[in-house]
């Protein structure tokens, strides 16, 4: 068998994939099909921007804020110079509120996702359910 024949046989198994003007991959190969399915999954994630998901994220933010506030109350409340001033407490309140919002926004707790899945009427049945 000559080298050109071997190379042409090897190239037959490589799917032809092209990029469309929108940036999506098009082609007949299984990779393109899997990528398309993943993009459709991302589109499902995009629907989470609806009102229910927004409310679920706000609930998670509130939960984290209450948890952080409870943890903060365990601190003594004194600094090296004595009691904290009003402005110091105000600054700390804003700081901890920001921490709570950032913790919830990163989704580390996953509460918003769970609440959204429980309350979303369009959700699909879980495998094995």
Curated annotation (Swiss-Prot):
Q: Which domain of life is it from?
A: Bacteria
Read off the InterPro entries from this record: Flagellar_prot_FlgJ_N (IPR019301)
Its name, as the record gives it, is: Uncharacterized protein TP_0959
This chain's source organism reads Treponema pallidum (strain Nichols)
